[in-house]
């Protein structure tokens, strides 16, 4: 990954967290953005949030225009990527892997 793309994703992550905190909806402004992945042309960004609730993801989709407007004003950029909000399930995967490794470790200890 090139440095420019990493910088863009990092800046966008910070701006999105600020944008969510500025919203009037208590469910949205308490969300955590865990990761941002921009497309190669930087016209589209996947925003990973810690929520598996489809209702929250739907609210985020409705608020996309306000969030993009905030990002544009705060950054001074000419254009903001289109945002797609995605549930981040990496924590759940990590917990499952930890449980599997613990089972393996218990099995080796019993041998």
Swiss-Prot record:
A single GO cellular-component term on record: cytoplasm
Disulfide bonds: none
Subunit structure of this chain's protein: Monomer. Binds 30S ribosomal subunits, but not 50S ribosomal subunits or 70S ribosomes.
Name this protein carries in UniProt: Ribosome-binding factor A
Cross-referenced InterPro entries: KH_dom-like_a/b (IPR015946), RbfA (IPR000238), RbfA_dom_sf (IPR023799), Ribosome-bd_factorA_CS (IPR020053)
GO biological process: maturation of SSU-rRNA
Gene3D superfamilies the UniProt entry points to: 3.30.300.20
């Amino acid at each position: 990954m090139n440095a420019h793309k990493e910088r863009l994703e990092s800046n966008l992550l910070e701006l999105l967290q600020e944008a969510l905190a500025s919203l009037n909806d208590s469910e949205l402004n308490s969300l955590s953005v865990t990761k941002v992945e921009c497309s190669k042309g930087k016209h589209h960004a996947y925003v990973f949030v810690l929520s598996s609730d489809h209702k929250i993801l739907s609210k985020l989709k409705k608020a996309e225009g306000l969030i993009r407007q905030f990002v544009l004003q705060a950054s001074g950029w000419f254009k903001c990527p289109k945002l797609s909000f995605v549930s981040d399930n990496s924590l759940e995967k990590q917990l499952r892997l930890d449980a599997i490794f613990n089972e393996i470790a218990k099995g080796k200890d019993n041998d």
